[in-house]
Design a protein with these regions (language model features):
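Sequence/structural segment immediately N-terminal to covalent heme-attachment motifs in c-type
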Residues: 28-49, 112, 116-140, 153-154
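Axial heme c-ligation environment in periplasmic c-type cytochrome domains
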Residues: 53-59, 75-108, 112-117, 144-149, ...
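Bacterial N-terminal signal peptides that target proteins for export
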Residues: 2-15
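Disulfide-stabilized extracellular ectodomain repeats and their linkers
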Residues: 39-42, 57, 65, 82, ...
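Bacterial N-terminal signal peptides
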Residues: 13-23
Length: 204
């Protein structure tokens, strides 16, 4: 669910996922069920079972249903801008977002299969101290307050999202995020990269 420039290769991969969705055979065992079939189109970018293997694409495996559904609604409605994600969010909403959200929430989350800069992660741990007030010491977030987990997401994805928040290009004008964006404006690009490395390292 990344707001970034799309490429022809990624569109082809996503199109392949749509073809799988249409032509998917019956699957027995733990993959059986409506959520699995409906989520096939997502796997082209987000990986098998939602375990992303790329820097800029988030992990969906183990994602709480409330946050997955919020993200889909935000993309589909245009509140979260992404020409790449908007049509897929609308498709997921039409197919049945509850089934897809439940499928990804039930998937085991694998250790992040990406290299993490240890020195950057160490610096990021220090920089993340003010973030812990909302996201928790270990980055798990707080569902009761609508605060998502940050831990174990790819560093490239986290960095991109932090840059978007800092520039007020994600959730623009949302009152609950005013203080967050003000804090991020005090961080330079290198510090945001360190923060991303730290939270990504929690998934190793």
């Amino acid at each position: 669910m990344a707001e970034r420039a799309h490429t022809p290769a990624r569109w082809l991969a996503a199109a392949a996922g749509l073809l799988l969705l249409v032509a998917a055979p019956a699957v027995a065992g733990p993959l059986d069920g409506p959520g699995y079939t409906k989520a096939l189109a997502c796997s082209a970018c987000h990986g098998q079972g939602g375990n992303s293997r790329t820097e800029a694409t988030p992990v969906l495996a183990g994602m709480p249903t409330w946050y997955f559904k919020k993200a889909i609604e935000d993309y589909a409605s245009g509140r979260r801008l992404s020409p790449e994600m908007e049509p897929f969010a609308k498709m997921v909403r039409q197919l049945g977002v509850d089934d897809v959200a439940a499928y990804f929430a039930a998937q085991p989350r694998e250790k992040l299969a990406l290299e993490i800069d240890r020195a950057a992660a160490a610096r990021g741990r220090t920089a993340a101290r003010p973030c812990a007030a909302c996201h928790g010491e270990d980055g798990y977030g707080d569902e009761r307050r609508g605060i998502p987990s940050l831990r174990g997401q790819p560093p490239g994805y986290l960095r991109n999202q932090l840059l978007l928040f800092r520039a007020d290009r994600r959730s623009p004008g949302e009152p609950a995020l005013v203080s967050v964006k003000a804090m991020l404006k005090s961080f330079d690009d290198a510090t945001l990269a360190d923060l991303a490395a730290y939270y990504a390292s929690l998934g190793r």
